[in-house]
Amino acid sequence: SPALTAPALWFGPVQNGKAEMYSASVSTYPDSSSSRIFLQNLKRKNDPNKPGRYSLADLSASDIQSKEPTFTSRQTVIRLDKGVHQIKLQGNEVTGFNGNSNNATFGIVSEGSFMPDASEWKKVLLPWTVRASNDDGQFNTFNKKENNGKPTYSQKYRSRDNSKRERDLGDIVNSPIVAVGGYLATSANDGMVHIFKKGNGDARNYSLKLSYIPGTMPRQYFDNDTSALKDSTLAQELRTFAEKGYVGDRYGVDGGFVLREVERGGKKHVFMFGAMGFGGRGAYALDLTKVDSNNPTAVSLFDVKNDNNNGNNGVKLGYTVGTPQIGKTHNGKYAAFLASGYATKTIDSTDNKTALYVYDLENNNGTPIATINVPDGKGGLSSPTLVDKDLDGTIDIAYAGDRSGKMYRFDLSSQSPDQWTVRPIFEGTKPITSAPAISQLKDKRVVIFGTGSDLSEEDVLSTSEQYIYGIFDDDTATTGTVNFTGTGGGLLEQHLTQEDKTLFLTDYKRSDGSGNKGWVVKLKDGQRVTVKPTVVLRTAFVTIRKYKDNGCGAETAILGINTADGGKLTKKSARPIVPEANTKVAQYSGHKKTSSGKSIPIGCMEK
């Protein structure tokens, strides 16, 4: 079973002078469109030959799969046009919606002379989504029901195998799993956001407390020139997930999200702000601390969605691929930051809005407190990165790029949101579809990002040259269009070469004014960067992907870059330590050398 998202990590009590470490990993089972979460206790391993150096002890399969969350206390809530409802069953039928739903709400319609049972939505579909009974046997009974020789219901429903835990979670593909403040959260392509809470005793004792369905999210295929799914919503897509022959080929909730634990008015809150990914054109805001209240619908603060009718929230959103952010603004409020995303694969289309939307998490009306439109932006705004310049806990600046190849700085230093501004710090020609990383040097910031896209089939198959950039920013300077000679555009060019599966960088130094605006690394044909880099001290770890086998496979490399000049790592650079016995890694860093005596700065992985 493949793991398609990185594990969650958290620390427990201190024992023998060291904090206990734990993780939660996801295994996904494509044949049943389901996932399982496994909880691990991570142990340190000492290296007697290298005092003070620790690594993680190996985990056996039984160690990895020894503990799972429990699912017996699940509550499910759904947002529809007339509000948020808890899906409660009386007998085996949903109750308490007070006439606010019908078959049409969930895309159950008549076809020709066939008229499905008018109560299918509450007798079959919603009970299927909440997994209320001990098994799915009742749906086998529903599948056999007939009325005058015709099926009673619009489709046959999928029966999930409880012994294989297929009923607990849908397939988790692009969404992360994150642990903060005693909560564990993820989202899945069953159309739900899943919230777990820690219990007493074992630090791995988590139980599913709430599943949230942002049912009003609008959908339409991004990579499709037809009107497929036009005017459809996530609520109407639930029946597709439940259909008997379904195998996971649709998106539910698969965007990134962020958790933030804060104290307001003497009370703890754990805010969650998440994007829909390709599951819809919008985002959702939750307060996880409300899961144990008498009213679980209070967990949902607000949803924001693309609004063609210029309604209350008045925003234009594409598919919100990537990760939104949460930060404290200069007016003292905790706010959620959402990029406008991508409405269509055609970059120059006016359907793509390029803007940054900001929402007050302490006021749940879902109306943005700021809409920062990007003049001349194209292709939609990608995920932002927030910066606290003086480390006082307040956000001063945000950076984000667009698919036309520009990188922008958003000035958020005013207490008044209507005074927030945006300007480009870099103009290129290649699409930027991931958030930048920031490295702080003595007198300036380095904004580090890569170019490339895998949003559409054409993107995946493209072999267009892409780049990694490090742009110097001191809050005032701006660069023009880059000249790839390494001098004309003020960027120092480092060269990337490959020997077998190992990548090598040059370490050219700045001279004659070259590199006064930053640095650039040109990638090989087909390579691209679609993931935010990770910065540790002065090292940027950049994930490079290249698709193969007609887009069905990929080679993935992790490249370590010196953030000061874009060159190879120095002896003092941060780098991963991987055990010699790890044969899954082609080459790794530090002490290893090639046959020609070259020091390997960091290795590559292929999956």
Where are these regions (language model features)?
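A fold-level detector for beta-propeller and closely related beta-sheet-rich head/sensor domains
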Residues: S1-K607
